[in-house]
Each structure stands twice: as structure tokens, then as C-alpha cells.
Amino acid sequence: VDLSPEAIAWARERADGAGARGVRFHRGDAFALTAAGAALAGPYDLIYDSGCFHHLPPHRRISYLALLERCLAPGGHFALTCFAAGEGGMGSELPDAELYRTGGLQGGLAYSPEALRRVFSGLTEIELRRMNDEGPRSPLFGEPFLWTALFRAPAGR
């Protein structure tokens, strides 16, 4: 799910190139497409967010967590890629209140490991680390200004 038709086309191209079958791509708002009773409401064994969370204003974290609660299967995994705060990171490190005073997200929000653990405290952390730096010749994507994280939902929820 992505708002961008270019992102959907790129993802479809990558999936086809990898020989992935049965992958469905949807263009639209992830919040609307996964609402209760909607076609994509889930549950899913894996939800992967690459670049959505760090572009949400602070007040949307509540609806984001509600989306995960609604769509992630018991024992399912949530993988996240987002801007890292601190040296070598990227994104705004302003406090939430200051973001509202300035009227913008400054290109995206940077998170510390502690902030991510606090936001996703209802999930079990499996791994949280900076991405490896992958060079331009690597077939893999990796930028050290990003966090990569894996969490698991409780099995009995």
C-alpha cells in the first residue's frame, strides 16, 4: 500500500524481478484501506513500513498504533524503517510541541531507540539497529541514517 503510483510501479517491478507471485499492490491511504471492514483490514502475519511512520505528525501515532492493533495478527511481525536521530541520522529532532509551533515536520521525524521503544511498547522488540551502509553496487538497500526494526505482536491478543 502506498499513496505514490511511482512507488507501486517500482515495488511491482522489484517483485516481478525477484519472481514473487501472489503479491498484491494497492495505491491509496493505508489508514482508509485497512479500516475495520475494509478490503485490506487483515489480519497480517507481517506488516512492513518503509518510510510512512517518520512522515506522520505526532498526533497520528495514535491512529497508527490502532492500525497495527487492528491489522497485525496475534504473534505477527512488524518491521519498520525510519529516520534515526543522533549523529549521522536524518530528520527533525524537534520536540513534538515545537513541531506544532513551527507548523511542519521538517521533512520527516527522527527517532531515538528509546522513543521507538516507547511508541511500540505494546510489541516485543526483536531487533532495533541502524541499517548497514550498502554501496551503490550492492543489490541491497542500506543507509546508516535509518533505523531498521523488527517487533512481534503478543500471541494471545
Regions found by a protein language model. Give the residues of each.
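Class I (Rossmann-like) S-adenosyl-L-methionine-dependent methyltransferase catalytic domain
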Residues: 1-42, 56-71, 76-157
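Conserved acidic residues
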Residues: 45
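A conserved beta-strand element that flanks and buttresses the S-adenosyl-L-methionine
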Residues: 48
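Short catalytic micro-motifs in class I SAM-dependent methyltransferases
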Residues: 51-55
